[in-house]
Swiss-Prot record:
Name under which the protein is recorded: UDP-N-acetylmuramoyl-L-alanyl-D-glutamate--2,6-diaminopimelate ligase
Function: Catalyzes the addition of meso-diaminopimelic acid to the nucleotide precursor UDP-N-acetylmuramoyl-L-alanyl-D-glutamate (UMAG) in the biosynthesis of bacterial cell-wall peptidoglycan.
A GO-annotated cellular component: cytoplasm
Pathway per the UniProt entry: Cell wall biogenesis; peptidoglycan biosynthesis
Gene: murE
Source organism of this protein record: Vibrio cholerae serotype O1 (strain ATCC 39315 / El Tor Inaba N16961)
InterPro entries: Mur-like_cat_sf, Mur_ligase_C, Mur_ligase_C_dom_sf, Mur_ligase_cen, Mur_ligase_N, MurE/MurF_N, UDP-N-AcMur-Glu-dNH2Pim_ligase
Top-level taxon of the source organism: Bacteria
UniProt binding sites for meso-2,6-diaminopimelate: R390, D414, N415, P416, R417, G465, E469
Amino acid sequence: MNTHSAISELIAPWLELTDPKLAALVITHLELDSRLIKSGDTFVAIQGHAVDGRQFIDKAIAQGANLVLAEADAQHLNGWVEYRAGVPVIYLAELGQHLSELAGRLYGGHHNQLIGVTGTNGKTTITQLIAQWLELLGHKAAVMGTTGNGFLNALEPAANTTGNALQIQATLRDLAERGAQYTALETSSHGLVQGRVKKLHFVAGVFSNLSRDHLDYHGTMEAYAAAKFSLFSEHACQNAIINVDDAVGAQWVKQLPQAIGVSLVTKPNTAQAIWAREVAYAESGITLNFESSWGEGELHAPLIGEFNACNLLLALATLLSLGFEKSALLATAPKLRPVLGRMELFQREQKAKMVVDYAHTPDALEKALRALRVHCAGQLWAIVGCGGDRDRGKRPMMAAIAEQFADRVILTDDNPRSESPQAIVADMVAGLTYPERAHIEHHRFQAASYALQHAGAQDIILLAGKGHEDYQVLANETIHYSDRETAQQLLELQP
């Protein structure tokens, strides 16, 4: 990536440097993590949510940083400059609040058009459907989110759904230099609240739904909803595409007069809209007859589940809002493919079907089980766990949903982290009406094996919670584990 800027230009909005030698220093790369510093990098030291980066200034310099930008405090006021081992450290007030703009001034200036997708569930599917559709229409498109960053056939792993502000701007610049005309970003509530996408300009923003998640961070559903809404209210967002079947979305469109409403149920009362007249679900996919501000049509795509019908409509509305032809979109829709680890079907004759899905919230689990019930001629199995060191309140809810919408329930582990797996499952069992009917097997592979051994050929087994993930986080280690590989191995399928 070929980027460079004089420090005086980069920090001009916040500080004027009077030392000409210092002002002429050139920045080529910004880095928040001292462990990743390479020779010539600029270390950005801020007061983080968990760690104070200023504690690692000396380490970053030892690693080769040629300049440090540090968050000002009572001891080091805005504009204060000190030298450590001959390396200048410049202190800036509220540096953490300016990261997105700072990175944009270094990495910006590209023509990569950005689409932000927010919501509790569906972000990964919607971003990847949009990117797939754009590629089918001849436009090079990338994604950034849970399953990785980059082009769909070569995603690079990402640590978080929404990376830090510096990573996002640098990645967008890199993708643009590699030919990306569009990038669809999953914009998490954490990323929005922490200002990681603050200075990005979105040609479209999409809201999928809101249900219980991340309350260990946000505290209340109201705060969680406000975080999501900020994509439309506090960020540069040209088009707002809102699922009005969601109660929160129905309220939001009243505050967004130019919003595009999307519904599987009824015609939205919005300036522009798209809504389903009839939806047919089959194992071969979804057929959706719709009306819209762009005319009526019929869409067929090889995805399953009511929520995927909604995801398809949201993706379609997004691309229509950007000026793409309806006829071209409908003609290419049958070539869309399910997303890795999202309602992904594994099957073999005379065996129960196994479906891997990322559903790890009560709402997502219910939707996944409801979707599979339509296709299940036998018994529906749910293999479900809950993460450790996360929202304990949803554990009994997850178990209750599994009991209500599945015929057979197996409680298992899903990244127990530092917590006791037995304690996590005990929290889940508290939500069961008939706990004696549930089977407990902490090892996920053994849980899936048990289900397949006891399931009939007409049964469907849902492995919920991990989706694309290929690891299990335990107390002191992270081990390799994949539900997808488990399904392939148990059904003796070629990977």
